[in-house]
């Protein structure tokens, strides 16, 4: 879950003003929620643009959470718009309508969610809190609530360790992290959000989400840290850093990393021990044991290396390009 902290005078705290998703509050026990977070090398506005824009998923996230063959025109419309944000509706919905219609809410200034109900599966939300840290940096809090029609998916999700789920989340985030980091510098040179209509070409109904976000920014909110320049562009290696942007702050992932590093010497010991057994040619049973132990130890070392990399740094090579 999320813990909200009021930094002002206690008497001024108003729980009714918390940025919450009503559907999750109405019947919280009916939801299975996967949570993650990460510090991202981009402004909160850039993150919100990205997660609001549904049309990029089949292309940018091909082979992670999207497929190019599912791409289709997005006939979306804004259904409500005021100083508190906006709502939108996409009748066909993702995957060429296979998942049903999708509604979107932007709860200004930092919260958005997509909401759909897939026939035969259940209700699915994608919830994002984009929290500004400093110019060019924000913290993402992402929630993935599911309301299943069957108990089986809920059970299967519960069996998966949280740190493995977080590794999967990293892969999706890194699909577009590099060019989003570069993109906001291009927009900054063009004049930022006030110049977005001249800088961006947004002629289709797929663009209504991003256009509405910038209308809200220019009419009500303004960009965080307005007037401050973006920091220098980071290297790809820095952009792929998972350890400092997530793992060091995550109890599940940091504990898993400690266990993985502690297990590696034991796997090496088994591998060397099996080599000794293989060197004893006289006893065939020992040779068989040595071969099995060596194979299992080598596989374990390979998997430990993969998990450690998954918790510390991304490859920098998006699955769509492989």
Where are the regions that the model predicts?
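C-terminal catalytic domain of Rieske-type non-heme iron oxygenases
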Residues: 4, 11-322
